[in-house]
Amino acid sequence: MKQGQIFKIHSDFYYVQSEGETFECKLRHVLKKQKQKILVGDYVEFKDGAIEKILPRKNYITRPSVANIDQVVIISAVKEPDLSFIQLNRYIAFAKYHNLNTILCFNKNDLSNDDKTIEKVFKIYEPLGFDILFTSALEGYGIEEFNSILQGKTSVLCGASGVGKSSLINAVSGINLRTKEVSDKTGRGTHTTRHCEIIDLDNSSRIVDTPGFSNLKFDFLLPLDIDTLFTEMIPYKGLCKYQDCLHINETDCAIKAHIGEIDETRYESYLAFVEEAKEYKEKVKYQGVKTETSHKQTHDKVAVKISLRKRQSARNTLKQNIYKDIDNE
């Protein structure tokens, strides 16, 4: 029995790295019956092209679904597309929910001479304890520092489409991932990364390239839980007059009293996330039972299915015959 790590998943095939080799495997039928979800980053035991066991995880995240990671690097563009603070705060809050160390990287610095944006970034996020770096994958600016934060860790790179994740990976890895320009019509990037995939930088450093996504919502938490995702709000959380204060229209709200010390854009993001969480509250009210883990249990439903027509012809013939016995066991 061999042990290895899933570095890529495509359709029903799982690509496992073990002792310097790559193995294409399928999931043993008994694991399918148990409805065990296997993620990129999972360590597994496998034999004869079949995954027999999923080993315990130290952590995992969803949207994107990745296991056994050390840190999240949030990539934003200074320009093209323009920096969106609400999108940035969304990623930060999501990483906070998963209790992961978070680094903020602002790419495409060569496209903007707006010092006010840079000053605003440092003013908001440096007091919150974030490591912040500015890069230009095109000009090589900040790449050495970017590479240094990845050393000895498994890092998930996340961010909206078009911010330059693939270009940064190309700059530090020497590989050549496909990149595309931001659309002039929409001002948004296109999805050059289609699936989560682990990329080795060296023996101890790996990055997880993830698809750009814009549909991340806080529709899996109750509104009262949202303020716990904002570090600067936590000291004032218990000082409001009302225990169930949402910090919106209530009187004697300690958090509203500190707007200014709490950045306005951060507070606006908080309000947006509370509105999204109200959808979950309505669902809980309708069902009558609060399910704390509903997000983790149902995230499979948001997975995008790969069209059967996209499969290589070999997978419709030879490989399906090879793995038929595995599926039936």
What are these regions (language model features)?
Residues K35-V40, K47-G49, P56-Y60, P64-S65, ...:
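Helix-rich effector regions associated with P-loop NTPase G domains
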Residues T22-K37:
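Beta-strand/loop nucleic-acid-binding surfaces
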Residues D12-V16:
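Short aromatic-glycine-enriched beta-strand elements
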Residues I86-Y97:
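Histidine-anchored nucleotide/phosphate-binding helix
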Residues L111-V163:
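Canonical P-loop GTPase G-domain recognition
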